[in-house]
Structures are given as structure tokens and as C-alpha cells.
Design a protein with these regions (language model features):
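Glycine-rich phosphate/dinucleotide-binding loop and adjoining beta-alpha-beta core of small-molecule
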Residues: 183
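Substrate/ligand-engaging "lid" and interaction regions
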Residues: 179
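Hydrophobic alpha-helical transmembrane segments
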Residues: 1-173, 186-314
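Pseudouridine synthase
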Residues: 176
Length: 314
């Protein structure tokens, strides 16, 4: 089989599996294993002296381990046969994508908000965001869901696909390890400030290009004149060097306002506003965000396939 198809077929199959099923909640998932490894390291090494150095070793060695494990699986399955590799690689691409699950989690929050009220919506939202949700209004809940969908469209969809395009599923898994490290220890509170410093910076570096690609693709699928100007105006109104790009794109598409003051892990964080239309947000906005996420995911997959076919097929 042509090597190009060893990249394209698992990509398409993994995308279709994610589109149909999303992350299975009852089957072992690599990211759960990554999380267990990180929890073990945090318990044993985030103490005493040299926390910053110990955290740096963890942040660099764990992604290397994930990538090497993926490389070993690649070599082993290719030794069996191309179709064996394609099947296994498809499963890892499926595990590496989070679009279906991201939308499912967001829909569960807004559905519970509509059917069971604000308190239930706050509780369900707390499962997927780091901010304190105990005093959020319905508008605040919708805003948090939309911000999360925009940010994770980059972190959970475009970035994994970007690294798959560069290095196959081993690179995709290495990136997922970095992203999991950042989500678990990449905080600025007293507990993680030193230990998680390298993880947070590495995640910022690896998401630099994907975040900007995400905003570009969001602007393309939205087909809204003036959206690029809106993105450039607000993309740096965020503590993260990357999250402002997809969030400003989503705020521009919806003509709404993100940001403001929120409590994270006991600390009040004042976020600059992204957008200036402080309007009410509704379920209709969530449906638009879902459509944008699906279209950006498809556009990313199609772009990778097109590049491989144009560059490597002679």
C-alpha cells in the first residue's frame, strides 16, 4: 500500500468514528492512562525542593514516552501488515479526536440548564470547566460552554490533527500527553506554579500554530465579512497566548461577548472582554457553535488529505 494511504485512511476512519460515537465512556482510553501517570508523578514529585526541575522532567519525558510507545506500536503493526496498521492507527486517531465528546458535553450542560434549572446546570458545567460555577447565571453558563467549545476546538481537534499530519498517531499521542499535563498541572496557584510551569509553557508552544489555524478555519466556514478584523482586534485579550484566537473567532461569529471576572481554584481572575455586544445568549447560539465545530473539523481533515494527495502522490 502506498505510504500516503497509510496516513489518509486512518485519518478518515478515525474522523468518521469520532463523528459517529465520540469517546467511549466504558472502554479504556489512552488519555485516562495519561492522567493516571500524571497523577502518580504529581503525588510523588510535587513536594520538597526542586519542584520546577522535577516538573520539567515530567513535562518532557512523559510526551517522549507517549510518542515512543506510539512509534513501537507503529513498527509492530506494520510488521504484521498494512491493514493491521490502518486498523490500529484508526483507533488511535479516534481516541485522539474530541469533537463529538466536546459537543456532547456542552449539549448535556445546556439541556440540563433548560430542563432542570440553573443549579443543575451549574453542577453539570463544573464537570468540564475549571472556573467556579456556583454563582453563574444562565447567561454565564451558556458563555462558559461556548468559550470551552471554542478553546477545545483548537486543543481537542485541530491541534491533534495538526500533529497527526506532521508525525502520524505517535505525534498525536505525544501532543495529547502535553495537553493532558497542562490541563492537570498547568496552573498558577500555589500547588502547581512551579511543578506545572514547564507543562504550561510546552502546551503554549505546541498550540501556537493550531490555535491560529483554528481561528482561520472558523472564519472560513463562517463566511462573515469583517470577522478577521474582529479576531485581530480581540485575539490578544486573553491570558493565554493561544486561546484568544478561537474564542475571539467564536465571539465574532455569534456577535456576543466573552471574558470578564471568574474564580479559578480559589483565585479571582479578571479576563479582558472579547467582543462588545453584551447580549443574552441562548440555545440557538449553542447550535451555531456546534455547526461551526463540525465544519472546522471536516475542513481540517479535508485540508490534510488534500495536502498529502497534492504533495506526495505523483
Amino acid at each position: 500500500m502506498n505510504e500516503v494511504w497509510l496516513v489518509i485512511l486512518p485519518l478518515i476512519a478515525g474522523y468518521l468514528l469520532d463523528l459517529a460515537f465520540g469517546d467511549p465512556r466504558t472502554i479504556p482510553h489512552p488519555v485516562v492512562g495519561f492522567g493516571n501517570m500524571i497523577s502518580w508523578a504529581e503525588r510523588h514529585f510535587n513536594c520538597g525542593r526542586f519542584r520546577k526541575w522535577k516538573g520539567a522532567v515530567v513535562a518532557l519525558s512523559f510526551p517522549l514516552f507517549a510518542g515512543m510507545a506510539g512509534w513501537g506500536i507503529t513498527v509492530g503493526t506494520l510488521a504484521v501488515g498494512d491493514w493491521c496498521f490502518c486498523i490500529v492507527a484508526s483507533v488511535f486517531v479516534f481516541y485522539g479526536l474530541a469533537n463529538h465528546s466536546l459537543i456532547r458535553e456542552g449539549r448535556e450542560v445546556v439541556d440540563i440548564l433548560k430542563k432542570q434549572g440553573v443549579e443543575a446546570g451549574r453542577r453539570r458545567l463544573s464537570w468540564i470547566v475549571g472556573r467556579d460555577t456556583s454563582e453563574l447565571s444562565p447567561k454565564g453558563i451558556y458563555t462558559a460552554v461556548l468559550e470551552t467549545m471554542a478553546e477545545n476546538l483548537s486543543d481537542g481537534v485541530v491541534a491533534p490533527l495538526f500533529y497527526y499530519a506532521l508525525g502520524g498517531f505517535p505525534a498525536m499521542m505525544a501532543y495529547k500527553m502535553v495537553n493532558t499535563l497542562d490541563s492537570m498541572i498547568g496552573y498558577k496557584d500555589e500547588r502547581y506554579r512551579q511543578f506545572g510551569c514547564m507543562a504550561a509553557r510546552l502546551d503554549d508552544v505546541l498550540n501556537y500554530i493550531p490555535a491560529r489555524l483554528t481561528a482561520l478555519f472558523m472564519a472560513l466556514v463562517a463566511n462573515r465579512p469583517g470577522l478577521f478584523r474582529f479576531i485581530f482586534r480581540y485575539c490578544h485579550q486573553h491570558a493565554s497566548p493561544n486561546s484568544g484566537f478561537p474564542e475571539s473567532a467564536m465571539a465574532g461569529i455569534l456577535d456576543c461577548r466573552f471574558g470578564g471576572a471568574h474564580v479559578y481554584h480559589g483565585l479571582l481572575v479578571e479576563k479582558p472582554y472579547i467582543g462588545d455586544n453584551d447580549r443574552e445568549i441562548s440555545y440557538a447560539d449553542f447550535r451555531i457553535a456546534v455547526r461551526v465545530n463540525h465544519m472546522v473539523t471536516l475542513l481540517t481533515v479535508v485540508s490534510i488529505v488534500a495536502v498529502y494527495l497534492c504533495v506526495f502522490i505523483k
